[in-house]
């Protein structure tokens, strides 16, 4: 029997940050300020199963990234440096001077520039099936000749995805979520309610372009990340979580060379979409990560 997922919040709010409008939800009453950055091709709804598990521990800010969901779809500014600045400005506007940040997939790619741009604000980061483009072994994910996925190159091609996917958004997303290599192990983890939202977001005017621009920004991201890495590692505490049937810890080395303090963890019987497949296991890892961070910052 299909059951509808609980929305991440009853209220979607909108705030203008620079030249863009960011849609977001604020959920929870816990003492920890937490920024949750969803992956591709989803929206903030990807965190809906995490919310009830963390709401007593954290005050969660859950945006739709630029180009996704109810956020605006600007013509430019999809490089992760620009998106990181937008996300930090959102947290500042909401009164959060310091916060933890968690990112899945493309949301995780925002964490390194976020930590480098705002070192006094970002207290810890957690990469969920994600890493830092241009560093370590990260580029292998987009190379189909070494086991990577062809969709990286397809999504980066100007205009072609818009021409081919219009009217076929559901077909494409169904393939993305259920592909053999790193797709869902628990096939019903993304239920009809969530899937429909992701399809509608992609099918909205400018939705395909907005989603693809995150991939088209990768050459700029690679250049920016290498420049940031040359400045030295971030002192921010970092966690890397990989799924056994997903990308795994293939990008771990990119994080290890970029942060001073890195821990890692596996989640078993899980594909790429950890927040929707294994929310309880992920929530426990995040709580443990925050406790570890607090133990490091306690004065002797």
PLM regions: where:
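Flexible "cap/lid" subdomain of the alpha/beta-hydrolase fold that forms the substrate-access gate
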Residues: 2-14, 20-22, 33, 61, ...
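Intrinsic disorder/low-complexity segments, especially N-terminal tails and targeting/processing regions
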Residues: 14, 19, 28-29, 300
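Conserved HGGG/HGGXW glycine-rich cap/lid loop of the alpha/beta-hydrolase fold
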Residues: 26-70, 255
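A short, glycine- and basic residue-enriched loop/turn
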Residues: 43-44, 109, 271
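Surface-exposed alpha-helical interface segments used for non-catalytic interactions
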Residues: 45-48, 52, 85, 112, ...
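Catalytic histidine-centered segment of alpha/beta-hydrolase-like enzymes
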Residues: 270-283
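A short, highly charged, low-complexity intrinsically disordered segment
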Residues: 294-300
